[in-house]
A protein has these predicted regions:
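C-terminal, helix-dominated tail/subdomain
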Residues: 1-38
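Catalytic and substrate-binding regions of extracellular carbohydrate-active enzymes
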Residues: 29-189
Length: 189
């Protein structure tokens, strides 16, 4: 649903390709309710006059891996054009830290196969300052990252990471994250 709006608003051929290819499997996907939420963009689709761009690009044409060093995110896929056979890894080590709506999850990863989560962050946001949000959802322990002597990462702009090195190859790809600024070493002394 969001890809459809992105395709229309930004005239984005890749978002249009995603919508087209998903609709090949489920032609009614855009007319189904999405968790009964108003954010499913039904109203947008009913009122917009913007057309979705033509299906001119295929997802197979995208690179299997992409690292966005400026934001500290990386995505790696095995078969991006066929999501039912695709293994995907997402990685985050962000120079923006864990401020505002961000989480203390530097050097965290998530894995998916066939569009379904295999290793994924736990928890959900119930309120910005409730115990669950502070001790689980926003905390490092709720993500696929390491704790140092049982301690999580800093929450704030000072708790940042970055991606100093990565490689995108035909047979193997990797990403290295440096989260040393996200961890307080004072408790180790």
């Amino acid at each position: 649903r969001y890809a459809d709006a992105l395709a229309r608003e930004c005239n984005n051929p890749w978002a249009a390709a995603y919508v087209h290819e998903i609709m090949q499997e489920d032609p009614d996907i855009l007319s189904k309710a999405f968790e009964a939420k108003p954010a499913d963009l039904t109203w947008y689709r009913c009122t917009t006059k913007k057309e979705r761009p033509a299906y001119s690009s295929k997802l197979l044409e995208l690179p299997q891996s992409k690292v966005f060093s400026q934001t500290g995110t990386a995505l790696m896929n095995t078969d991006i054009g066929h999501h039912t056979n695709n293994a995907m890894l997402s990685f985050r080590s962000s120079p923006y830290g864990a401020t505002s709506h961000a989480l203390a999850n530097q050097n965290a990863f998530n894995t998916f196969f066939g569009g379904k989560a295999i290793f994924y962050s736990s928890g959900h946001r119930t309120g910005f300052t409730d115990d669950h949000c502070m001790y689980a959802y926003r905390n490092t322990r709720a993500h696929n990252s390491i704790l140092v002597n049982g301690m999580g990462q800093k929450i704030g702009t000072e708790g940042y990471g970055w991606i100093p090195r990565y490689y995108e190859g035909e047979e193997i790809s990797y990403v290295v994250g440096d989260a040393s600024n996200a961890v307080s070493y004072t408790h180790l002394r």
